[in-house]
Amino acid sequence: MFLFSSRRITSLRSYTIIKHSSCYSTLVSDGNIFSIQHFQSLMQKYESNLKIIHQLHSHFTTSGFLLLHQKQNSGKLFLFNPLLRCYSLGETPLHAYFLYDQLQRLHFLSDHNKSLPPFDSFTYLFLLKASSNPRFPSLLLGIGLHGLTLKLGFESHVYVQTALVGMYLVGGNMIDAHKVFDEMPERNPVTWNVMITGLTNLGDFEKALCFLEKMPNRTVVSWTTIIDGYARVDKPKEAILLFSRMVACDAIKPNEITILAILPAVWNLGDLKMCGSVHAYVGKRGFVPCDIRVTNSLIDAYAKCGCIQSAFKFFIEIPNGRKNLVSWTTMISAFAIHGMGKEAVSMFKDMERLGLKPNRVTMISVLNACSHGGLAEEEFLEFFNTMVNEYKITPDVKHYGCLVDMLRRKGRLEEAEKIALEIPIEEKAVVWRMLLGACSVYDDAELAERVTRKLMELERSHGGDYVLMSNIFCGTGRFLDAQRFRKQMDVRGVAKLPGHSQVT
């Protein structure tokens, strides 16, 4: 066991006041080796700091630390598995495989026998999670790991087998996922939930519901996963029906996450009565005083269901000490949706007086309010300049879109075109598309042609652009030009997505 000198202990304590990476470099620069306990404490403390995780990885595999502790196999696992876990769940999951490979090589170099390194089931659990990480999923690596887990005798380890099910589902391989699931000697609620989640993410709600029915002990996660899945794929009626069924079930009660999942379905339908019912339910369950996320979502739902009065009443009932930036932004956005520009601006100024600084989403909300509420151009530009100069927020395409929207609503299309040309952002097709819509309103075919040329430079596969330009030509009597655009659409194989309505 290696002990720290007093100088090194002092350095360790300075972590709280010095930049993490600089302090870490100071600790290891003289070549002294960490103790296992110290390594573990660093992992626990900085598991979300990717830079320090990389430094620990480097020190772990290159400094001789592993060789000095080679007799403490359990110690190596305690150090290796947390590093692996951080990588598998983080932004660089492939580093988990690099680390695993390095440890194998070091083991072969340090031991006379050539047996497999002393990894445990958690090692392969984290490697499987790395292979199913949404950022860089790798079914090929996962299949290789499947074979290795069988060779090592982990077919009876429920968490390893559950990770295999998840890996196959993330890779879209439902057949092998079912096979692993069916062959498992033991399944726990996590296994069932992984299966339900995977099927829901793949859009197979029928099978997901089938597994929900078969599940021996349903959990709130099981219900919420499918409810959230329905809401995300624009099936609000199905989400609400399943939520109603869940509420009627005595054994399982919705939690805060369930409420956050169902509210988008409620406002998607614009069902004010259902919104009130959900509000009454969460009040009865005591969620509103406890969870500000539920409170903010209810404000948003009331506004999007068309009842700005209920949204505002609910907002003012919340003590200022509980309101966060999302609360204020939600209410400002609610006023913007209803064209109440003055009220939104007043709300923004109240927020500033309380010392809350807006973020870029807040600024989009207040700029939209100025545009939709018909406020003076000077007031809009004042907020835009405040955002840039006082709050140091760099405008993105949505902020510029608000500016173009304000100008187009006032019929100043040429000025809007100049702004669109000057936007220093590549992803600006949405701004040009907004301007093309304004050309349709004002029957400005000449400007529409220029705008369409810009859109074609950025994105040629958007069917709506061709159709809108064709309609503008028809509206100004240029039928041959309209026919030409329709032919271009056919030649380029561009499809127009059909519209749909939920009104029955």
Swiss-Prot record:
Compartment list: Mitochondrion
UniProt entry keywords in alphabetical sequence: Mitochondrion, Repeat, Transit peptide
Gene Ontology MF: a single term: RNA binding
Residue span of region Type E motif: 431-504
GO cellular component labels: cytosolic ribosome; mitochondrion
Keyword Repeat tagged: yes
Keyword presence, Repeat: yes
PPR repeats: 76-110, 120-156, 157-187, 188-222, 223-253, 255-289, 291-321, 324-358, 359-390, 396-430
Transit peptide region: 1-87
Coiled coil: none
One matching Pfam family: PPR_2
A GO biological process held by the record: RNA modification
Listed PANTHER family: OS01G0815900 PROTEIN, PENTATRICOPEPTIDE REPEAT-CONTAINING PROTEIN
Similarity section: Belongs to the PPR family. PCMP-E subfamily.
Protein name: Pentatricopeptide repeat-containing protein At1g09220, mitochondrial
